[in-house]
Amino acid sequence: RALPIATGKDWDGHKVKQGAVLYVAGEGGFGVTQRVRAWELQHKVNNLDNLARLPVPIFPADNDQVKATIEYCYEIESKTGHAVKLIIFDTLARCYGGNDENSSKDMGAFIKGCDTIKQLTGATVLVVHHSGKNVDNGGRGSSSLPAALDVEYRVSREGENLQALILTCSKMKD
């Protein structure tokens, strides 16, 4: 959903409010570049000025990095004329700074950093996270993460050769 927000193009038949997007590619940066290029070709778009990509992780559990992220969001707004509406941390494991993902204390610091970024920028913060070995048990690590989430979606594959992506809402607060 990052690219429709950055361009203001409809997503799956729904109107989208345009804004800037910050994509933190903590892993798979080359793959992200390929997917962005494929989307540009498919949608005949060649102006993604509202998409800022960082090829290195940001650690929301680190107060200095939280401040730097907020300042960077304001720089993006100044440059593009659009407030940052979406910040994507891809993935939690890479943006966790070596902390223990099973520790509620460490996860609490990560959540607090994300909340501070969200509150001070007004952006939605999306964290890409991997499930554990048992997919039915949800994401890896401390249970304080799912407890703090407003919304959680699970992405799975289905069908012949696992071609179809299925997006399932597994939690919706309020």
Which residue ranges define each predicted feature?
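Phosphate-binding/switch region of NTP-binding enzymes
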Residues: 86, 94, 105-174
